[in-house]
C-alpha cells in the first residue's frame, strides 16, 4: 500500500532534513510505501538543492520546483497532481502536525472513510490573535458559505485516491483548498490531535496573507457579500425616503426652513462611502472572474527529478 505525503516548502532548508529523517525513522510507517512529494514554492535558500539531493538517494522522494513563488494553495494542488499513492496526506514540513497522527488517519481510511480530517484539539502553540481571528473566520465562513468547513482543521488530512482525482478535475485558478476539499464530499471521519511547536525556522504566513486567504475562502464559496448590498441599498433608500418625507411635512406643517449644508454634506459622504464599499466588494468578484477567464496555469514547474 502506497501513502503519499504532499509537503509544500518555502525557504525551509533547516526543517526539510529533520522532517525527512522523522518520516523515514518512524516505525509505524515502515510497513507502508511512503512517497514524499516536496513542492519547492520558489525558495531563495538551499531548499531546492536539498530536496533534489534527497531524491537522488531515495526513489520515493519526488522534488517539484516552481519557477517562482506561486503560493501554498497552488503548491498543494501541484502535490496532488503528482502524488501517486493510494492515499494522499498534505502535511507541513515544520512538524507542527505530528507524524504520529498519520497511522490514526490511515486506520480511519482503511475502515471506510474517503477523507479523514486531522482536527486540532489544542491550538495553544498559536498566538492568541491568530486563534481568535481563525475562530471568527470559521464562524463567518460557515454562516454564509456552502459547503461548511470543519473548525480547527487545516490542510493536514488524509484523502483517498478517488477524492484526489475529483479534486484534480476542478479548473479554478483562485484556490481555497480547505473549501475545495470540503466541496468534493464523501464519507468523512475525524482524528483529533494536539498541535506541536515548530521544529525549525519561522512561519511564512503573515497577517496580510491570512487576510487574503480569508477573502479567497469567502468569495470562492459564497455570493452573500454581493447579495447583502441589495439589502443595504434598500435600507438606505428607505431611510432617505422617510427623512425626505419628514422634511417636506415639517416644512409644510410647521413652516421650518430646510436645514442646510451640514446635513446635506454628511448624507452625501455617507452614501458615497456606502457606494465605494459596495463597488469594492463587486470589484473583488469581478477581479477573480477576470483571472479565471485568462485560464493561466495554476503553477509552472521548473524541474521534476527522480
From Swiss-Prot:
<feature type="transmembrane region" description="Helical">
    <location>
        <begin position="228"/>
        <end position="248"/>
    </location>
</feature>
<keyword id="KW-0812">Transmembrane</keyword>
<dbReference type="InterPro" id="IPR029044">
    <property type="entry name" value="Nucleotide-diphossugar_trans"/>
</dbReference>
<keyword id="KW-1133">Transmembrane helix</keyword>
<keyword id="KW-0472">Membrane</keyword>
<dbReference type="InterPro" id="IPR001173">
    <property type="entry name" value="Glyco_trans_2-like"/>
</dbReference>
<feature type="topological domain" description="Periplasmic">
    <location>
        <begin position="249"/>
        <end position="262"/>
    </location>
</feature>
<keyword id="KW-0328">Glycosyltransferase</keyword>
<dbReference type="Pfam" id="PF00535">
    <property type="entry name" value="Glycos_transf_2"/>
</dbReference>
<keyword id="KW-1003">Cell membrane</keyword>
<protein>
    <recommendedName>
        <fullName>Prophage bactoprenol glucosyl transferase homolog</fullName>
        <ecNumber>2.4.1.-</ecNumber>
    </recommendedName>
</protein>
<dbReference type="InterPro" id="IPR050256">
    <property type="entry name" value="Glycosyltransferase_2"/>
</dbReference>
<keyword id="KW-0997">Cell inner membrane</keyword>
<feature type="topological domain" description="Cytoplasmic">
    <location>
        <begin position="1"/>
        <end position="227"/>
    </location>
</feature>
<keyword id="KW-0808">Transferase</keyword>
<comment type="function">
    <text>Involved in O antigen modification. Catalyzes the transfer of the glucose residue from UDP-glucose to a lipid carrier.</text>
</comment>
<feature type="topological domain" description="Cytoplasmic">
    <location>
        <begin position="284"/>
        <end position="306"/>
    </location>
</feature>
<comment type="similarity">
    <text>Belongs to the glycosyltransferase 2 family. GtrB subfamily.</text>
</comment>
<dbReference type="GO" id="GO:0005886">
    <property type="term" value="C:plasma membrane"/>
</dbReference>
<feature type="transmembrane region" description="Helical">
    <location>
        <begin position="263"/>
        <end position="283"/>
    </location>
</feature>
<dbReference type="GO" id="GO:0016757">
    <property type="term" value="F:glycosyltransferase activity"/>
</dbReference>
Amino acid at each position: 500500500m502506497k501513502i503519499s505525503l504532499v509537503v509544500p516548502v518555502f525557504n525551509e532548508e533547516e526543517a526539510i532534513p529533520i522532517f525527512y529523517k522523522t518520516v523515514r525513522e518512524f516505525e509505524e510507517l515502515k510497513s507502508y510505501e511512503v512517497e514524499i512529494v516536496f513542492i519547492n514554492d520558489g525558495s531563495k535558500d538551499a531548499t531546492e538543492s536539498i530536496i533534489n539531493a534527497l531524491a537522488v538517494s531515495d526513489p520515493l522522494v519526488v522534488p517539484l520546483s516552481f519557477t517562482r513563488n506561486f503560493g501554498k494553495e497552488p503548491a498543494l494542488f501541484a502535490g496532488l497532481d503528482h502524488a501517486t499513492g493510494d492515499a494522499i496526506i498534505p502535511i507541513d514540513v515544520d512538524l507542527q502536525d505530528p507524524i504520529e497522527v498519520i497511522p490514526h488517519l490511515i486506520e480511519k481510511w482503511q475502515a471506510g472513510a474517503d477523507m479523514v480530517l486531522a482536527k486540532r484539539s489544542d491550538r495553544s502553540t498559536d498566538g492568541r490573535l491568530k486563534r481568535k481571528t481563525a475562530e471568527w473566520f470559521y464562524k463567518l465562513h460557515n454562516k454564509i458559505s456552502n459547503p461548511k468547513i470543519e473548525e480547527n482543521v487545516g490542510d493536514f488530512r488524509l484523502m483517498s485516491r478517488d477524492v484526489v482525482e475529483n479534486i484534480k478535475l476542478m479548473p479554478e485558478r483562485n484556490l481555497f483548498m480547505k473549501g475545495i476539499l470540503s466541496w468534493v464530499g464523501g464519507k468523512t471521519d475525524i482524528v483529533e490531535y494536539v498541535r506541536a511547536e515548530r521544529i525549525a525556522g519561522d512561519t511564512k504566513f503573515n497577517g496580510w496573507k491570512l487576510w487574503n486567504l480569508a477573502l479567497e475562502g469567502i468569495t470562492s464559496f459564497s455570493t452573500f457579500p454581493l447579495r447583502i448590498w441589495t439589502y443595504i441599498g434598500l435600507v438606505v433608500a428607505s431611510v432617505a425616503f422617510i427623512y425626505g418625507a419628514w422634511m417636506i411635512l415639517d416644512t409644510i406643517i410647521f413652516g421650518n426652513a430646510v436645514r442646510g449644508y451640514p446635513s446635506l454634506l454628511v448624507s452625501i459622504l455617507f452614501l458615497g462611502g456606502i457606494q465605494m464599499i459596495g463597488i469594492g466588494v463587486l470589484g473583488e468578484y469581478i477581479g477573480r472572474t477576470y483571472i479565471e477567464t485568462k485560464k493561466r496555469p495554476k503553477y509552472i514547474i521548473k524541474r521534476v527529478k527522480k
